[in-house]
Amino acid sequence: MPTSDRARLADQRPERSSFILYVEGPRDRSILRAWAQRLLPDRAPDLLADAVILGGRRPARAVEDFRARSAGSLGLCVLDRDEDANAEPEPHAGLEFFTWGRRHIESYLLVPGAIRRALSLPSSDHRLEATLERELPEDDSGWRAFDAKRLLAETGPLARLLGRPLPLARIARATREDELHADVHEMFGRLRHGLRAMPRRSWRSRAGDLL
């Protein structure tokens, strides 16, 4: 990281210990914020507003930033699996890593009911379900390699089918708790555990983006 970036982050960093959430990009943050409104409604606004953007799958950046934090800080870094089947980085003291079981966080938005509610699709329109049945993997190994970003892209198959881009954050908000995949519940379980270890005053930790 350039020296100027380190200085900027140091100026913004609070002196007291804090809980820091690291995510790959703004889209990840918006999806997590939507899920958090359902799973962590009292903590979502502060925590997700102040999540640190890494600018891609860059666990080393999270470690570098976290090492410069105040003693006693805790953190969770949430990463896509991408194409690496063994992608779980080594934990750093106080900083945990969570890697999605599927290739991308967007994979967990491919819930027909949530997409239908988010787009207010008429009940007589069954094109969505037919397309997902044809496109989606049948087993976990298939999901680990499946490119959900392609399917959900602004000009991807679903957008062309439905005649409009898919609003990913709205789909995340429309996903009911019992529709969320076990991986999502596991990640939020890790998040709750970390938050319980910190006083409430330390939830906010505006740190800027590491882009």
Predicted segments, located by residue:
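Acidic, divalent-metal-binding catalytic cores of TOPRIM
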Residues: 1-211
